[in-house]
């Protein structure tokens, strides 16, 4: 009887200790009276859902906006000089952490904030850049969430071939100056060669370049392309570029393989990408570790899962019959 009483007492004490520990663990962010300042730089409006996911994730972790954490959110559309000015202001303001996205702003943030020893969390691609040392050990004062843009572009090319094996001329517009373009092209060209596909490349420097090329093709007896694969770079997904691409595709019954979630309801027959809000929440989890003292460069990059989404009506309008084997791979069908 005494043994049973002792065991019950021990269990009760242990449960109480765990409960108290969990309570204070949850209260730590406010109990230590520390206030954090986080500078957020988004290089394009299309990535705002990632920022929203980041803030939401920080809320879940116990950070209270206007209480123990303050955000300076700066949104710029593909303006490299503005990226630098914004990060310089973050440095002058002595923020505790910088959250930068996508690739270009992250590269600028790393360079500008290096001497200030401000940790950086980013969401972006790493291929073809020196932004990190490796996936497992980013190094220096940076870590984050990897988008895997080149890999998704290559996989989408394979999916296009699976859906429409007769389509041999694949239109590939891209920003020739974007940091990951070379790495993307190397991978996509390799896949195209293996599948015996002809990439009709358009190296562009502006939205006007894309618009002009599509207008030129529209006047030809043969437009010279069978389908369109969108590469991971902001230029092609900016409003004027995207409007021109979707209008052209609709007129000529072309399939568009997109690279952003919102494109599934805006002209793309299918997209293969990670969920933006989830990426933001993953970045928040990393930021939390850094704010509690773990060196940024020691935290491995996170690589989120790619999800295949299909707009069934869009595919049908383009005259495409989706096979059962293809549909089995789909994570979400929009009708």
Model-found features: residue ranges?
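Short hydrophobic alpha-helices and adjacent helix-cap/hinge residues
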Residues: 1-335
